[in-house]
Structures are given as C-alpha cells and as structure tokens.
A protein has these predicted regions:
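Catalytic-loop motifs flanking and including active-site residues across diverse enzymes
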Residues: 68, 204-211
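A conserved active-site-flanking secondary-structure segment within enzyme catalytic domains
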Residues: 166-193
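Glycine/charged-rich beta-loop-alpha catalytic/anionic-binding loops adjacent to active sites
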Residues: 54, 190-197
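Residues at secondary-structure transition points
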Residues: 131-134, 172, 203
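Extended, subdomain-level signal for the structured scaffold at the beginning of enzyme domains
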Residues: 2-150, 158-161, 178-179, 188, ...
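Structural detector of well-ordered beta-strand residues that form the stable sheet scaffold
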Residues: 150-151, 172, 189, 200
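A short glycine-threonine-serine/GTX helix/turn-capping micro-motif
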Residues: 197-204
C-alpha cells in the first residue's frame, strides 16, 4: 500500500475523531458516550512515523482574529497523536474580533511547560492589549524559550517579538504592521511564511493555512502534509487578485493602509517602552 493511501486511511480516521471528540482530540481518543465515529478504518498499515505525541499550545486572548487561529488549528488537529490545547488566562469563552467565541481547553498555568509548538494568532487592537498584558507576555516568553517550534500568524508575530522571541530572527506578519517587527529587533521579511531556525511566522490572516501545512510537513513529512491538504481540498482560487499590496489596486492599498496609523503608533510605543525597560 502506498504512503498516500495509508495516509488517507489514517487521516480520515483522525479527522473523524477530531469532529466527534473536540479540539483536544487525538486519533486514539474515544468518542463521547452515545456518539460513535461513522467510519472505522484499519490503522495497521500506517507508518509508525506518522503517529506522534506532539504537545501544541495555541494562545487565546480577547479580540484575537478567529481565522488566524482556526486555520492552523485544523491542520494541527489532523496530526495523529497530537494534543492541541487552546490556552487562555481562564477557561471562560474568549471572543474574537468578529464576535466568534472559543472555549479554551487549558489555562496558562495548566499549559505544559515544555511544548513542541507554541502558536500565537494576531488581531487588531486585541494583540496590542495582549502585548501590554504582562502575564500573557511572560507566558509567551516562558513557553517560547523552551518550545521546539515558535509560530505565529498575522500580527501575532508582534506578540512574539514583544516577548523577546524574535530578536535577530527573520520574521513576517500582516503587511500593515510588518515593519514594526524591526522596532523589536526582528528582521522583517515580505514573504507568506518565513522560517528562521525554529521560528515560523505567517503573513496576514489567510497565511495561517499555509503555515499550518508547513508545520504538518515539519512535524511529520511531505506526504502526510499533502494528504491533509487534499483532505481539506485546499486549492485556493480567490475571485480577485488583491491579496497583497503588490497585486491590489493602489487605491485599495491606500484605503486599507490608511486605516491603521493609530495601531502602528501604539505598536511602536510598546516597542520603545520594551527597549527602554531592557536599557536599550
């Protein structure tokens, strides 16, 4: 049996367990009483290397951007054997910047000290508030210092930078605020996904899908990632070619870019305060 065929058998079972078992489910998780997976598969042909025990923590904070989180979470949750935790200050639902509420599965204190992956989503004003929340910053700095992989999407890289995790690293983020990374000592890069050693950062919002697939390949292998991509039918063909400043009409770029002077000013102030606190 080919690797691709083995994967589709295994990944379909993994996806079913995620659907019936919740965010933190793994391929070995039993469905809740009275709810059984509709598909049963023979897993005996699965390559041993495709079953892991990854510990993944995805940070939640008020006002996060939902797609920043949900896109990568789909791919992380399809890593067979992985434990994917949604971590916040409390277990109370956390509301995104578009009003979608997500229930955390662990608090900051309950999150494992040693992680395979730390992930931080971005947002607008919410990430700035998070950057000024000393408890969140301390958590990100602590877990990120030991995590095997430190990752983010969109303006989430600003929070990583605020925690001192991107100093001297190449990194990306949402185009509106990418250059602010330099104020924290990072090296801004205009790419959709940037890997520098064990730091992997994604550009704005939808780049989380690409980051998620990138991490699946890193944590398993390319065939596994291709199988997850096929399972998700991820083959984007947007109706407009306006997804970057390089391709969007200049009037649109000017309009969107002109909405964020306050965001940029506050982010730069946080950077100055951070550097001053370090004596820099």
């Amino acid at each position: 049996m080919s690797n691709r065929r083995r994967f589709l058998i295994a990944a379909t079972s993994s996806a079913a367990s995620v659907l019936v078992g919740g965010v933190g489910a793994t391929a070995a998780t039993a469905p809740p009483p009275g709810r059984e997976a509709s598909l049963e598969h023979d897993m005996s042909a699965m390559p041993p290397s495709w079953m892991g025990a990854d510990k993944i923590a995805m940070l939640l904070y008020p006002g996060f951007t939902a797609l920043d989180l949900v896109g990568p979470q789909y791919f992380f949750a399809n890593l067979m054997g992985a434990s994917v935790q949604l971590v916040a200050k409390t277990r109370a639902p956390v509301t995104s910047d578009t009003g979608l509420s997500i229930v955390p599965t662990a608090t900051l204190d309950e999150c494992p000290a040693d992680l395979d992956v730390l992930f931080v989503p971005g947002s607008g004003g919410g990430v700035l508030n998070a950057m000024e929340d000393l408890a969140l910053v301390a958590f990100v700095a602590d877990r990120g210092a030991r995590a095997k992989w430190v990752t983010s999407v969109c303006t989430g890289s600003l929070l990583l930078a605020r925690a001192g995790l991107l100093t001297g690293y190449r990194a990306t983020g949402h185009w509106v605020a990418r250059d602010v990374l330099g104020d924290f000592g990072a090296i801004p890069v205009d790419e959709r996904v940037v890997r520098d050693r064990n730091r992997v950062t994604g550009a704005g919002v939808s780049a989380g899908l690409d980051l998620g697939l990138t991490m699946v390949a890193e944590l398993r292998d390319r065939s596994y990632a291709e199988g997850v991509q096929l399972l998700a039918e991820y083959a984007p063909k947007p109706p407009f070619d306006a997804g970057t400043p390089a391709t969007a009409p200049q009037a649109v770029v000017d309009m969107i870019g002109g909405m964020f002077p306050g965001f940029i000013a506050r982010a730069r102030r946080i950077a100055r305060d951070t550097q001053s606190a370090k004596g820099g």
